[in-house]
């Protein structure tokens, strides 16, 4: 099987095209600056992953920006920091500002010449629209967790795309 045998490429965005780890760590800085313990980047990302996956399981229909607001609140509780709901919501909306990897735009422009491009993402439509503006490509299909009503790795996500 050769790559030229395919007409459509489907992939995730966050971690593939958008540097979600750097975006998260930067957006969490107002919170982590208040923490008395010394947190490494890995500490932050591991705690975030735990709270994110738990929240996704409990509330699979929640929009990603709302889910991230809950994650922010849970991180603050874990780290013993007081935060306002407005701070939590600001973090939830930060996805739109997360940076693209340096080579993403060029790679997508090249791939678009040869393939239909499809996105399957755990984010919501609002968050993805901000990221898509950074990527500057027309995707032939965009399937968000908001559209599907579940989060990956649920089979529902992949069935919806197909």
Each language-model region and where it sits:
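Substrate-recognition element of Asp-dependent hydrolases with the DxDx(T/V) motif
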Residues: 85-99, 104-133, 143-145
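Structured loop/turn residues at beta-strand edges in well-structured enzyme cores
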Residues: 4, 113, 137
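Conserved Lys-Pro-Asp/Glu-containing loop-to-beta segment of HAD-superfamily phosphomonoesterases
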Residues: 151-162
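Histidine-bearing beta->alpha loop at or near hydrolase active sites
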Residues: 147-149
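N-terminal helical cap/lid subdomain that shapes the substrate entry/recognition surface
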Residues: 3-102
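Receiver (REC) domain switch/active-site residues of two-component response regulators
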Residues: 140
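Short glycine-/acidic-enriched loop or helix-start segments at secondary-structure transitions
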Residues: 20-21, 27, 129-131, 154
């Amino acid at each position: 099987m050769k790559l030229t045998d395919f007409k459509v490429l489907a992939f995730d965005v966050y971690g593939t095209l958008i540097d979600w780890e750097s975006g998260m760590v930067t957006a969490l800085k107002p919170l982590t600056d208040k923490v008395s313990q010394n947190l490494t980047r890995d500490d932050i990302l591991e705690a975030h992953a735990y709270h994110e996956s738990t929240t996704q399981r409990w509330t699979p229909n929640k929009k990603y920006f709302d889910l991230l607001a809950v994650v922010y609140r849970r991180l603050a509780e874990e780290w013993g920091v007081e935060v306002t709901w407005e701070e939590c919501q600001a973090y939830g909306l930060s996805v739109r500002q997360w940076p693209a990897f340096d080579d993403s735009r060029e790679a997508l422009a090249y791939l678009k010449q040869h393939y239909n491009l499809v996105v399957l993402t755990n984010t919501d439509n609002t968050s993805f629209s901000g990221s898509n503006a950074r990527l500057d490509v027309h995707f032939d299909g965009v399937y968000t967790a908001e559209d599907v009503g579940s989060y990956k790795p649920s089979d529902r996500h992949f069935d919806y795309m197909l």
